[in-house]
């Protein structure tokens, strides 16, 4: 069933981010703790924007949840570290054209895109962001502006999932980036990225419990938090038999 997402008109941060995306070319980093409406914002933008856009995410599950594609599949990225000194990613002499060999429709899509949305940005490595920047510059025929002049919307929470970096990859990336996180990408030294943090938690209504979750999130748990959590230890929950099913159709039956 198709659901229309209605924004909270009293939520100033939501409205500020919405106005920037809808009525300007300003790139935005939208963040906030769990349950503050990041996914709702993303869906609302996708449903209402008139801009030609694409929704991307670092993993298949995240891409499905966001209603988009993975970064690697959309840009045809290799899975090894995409280093700034790799000649295949050079802006000179058509090297990117030679390496990626996109189809004509895909090249046209990259050129005409106005808004690039990346969900779960906390899981995206810095080198991937820099590679996307170079690709968009080349296929937008705009080498001077970051991301080829495209508007970028990054959505996520750096307190949640981090980039997956294997041991040998970390050693390689450390030569070029202070951290593997997206915000260490070199392109962000050239772009005015506005950060907006959603504040209102919609998922939980118990303010005391929300405060405990905040303390866990920021690694500032105190004795009072532990005492409160321990009051729930040993609580009896009604048991029922679990039935493992392999398809949603079977579950519906």
Which sequence ranges carry the predicted segments?
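Conserved ATP-binding/catalytic motifs of P-loop helicase motor domains
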Residues: 1-249
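Extended, polar beta-sheet/loop recognition surfaces of beta-rich domains
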Residues: 253
